[in-house]
Amino acid sequence: MADVKITQVRSTIGARWKQRESLKTLGLRKIRQTVVREDNAQTRGLLQVVRHLVTVEDVK
């Protein structure tokens, strides 16, 4: 499967608990921090919850 590069671009101040936990599960703690994760259903579900806090790019 392909990978996705996820970068946190907005703060979690004012975010709901589920959004903070989703970012923690993805491995993001700071603004402009980037992680590479496998593109699967679980990752896509987490990204759906925090789509307004992150940017997503495909990695080939």
UniProtKB/Swiss-Prot annotation:
GN (gene name): rpmD
NCBIfam families recorded: rpmD_bact
Assembly and interaction partners: Part of the 50S ribosomal subunit.
GO cellular component, one term: cytosolic large ribosomal subunit
Species of the source: Mycobacteroides abscessus (strain ATCC 19977 / DSM 44196 / CCUG 20993 / CIP 104536 / JCM 13569 / NCTC 13031 / TMC 1543 / L948)
InterPro entries xrefs: Ribo_uL30_ferredoxin-like_sf, Ribosomal_uL30_bac-type, Ribosomal_uL30_CS, Ribosomal_uL30_ferredoxin-like
Keyword entries, A-Z: Ribonucleoprotein, Ribosomal protein
Name assigned to this protein: Large ribosomal subunit protein uL30
Coiled-coil blocks: none
GO BP field: translation
Keyword Ribonucleoprotein among record annotations: yes
GO molecular function per UniProt: structural constituent of ribosome
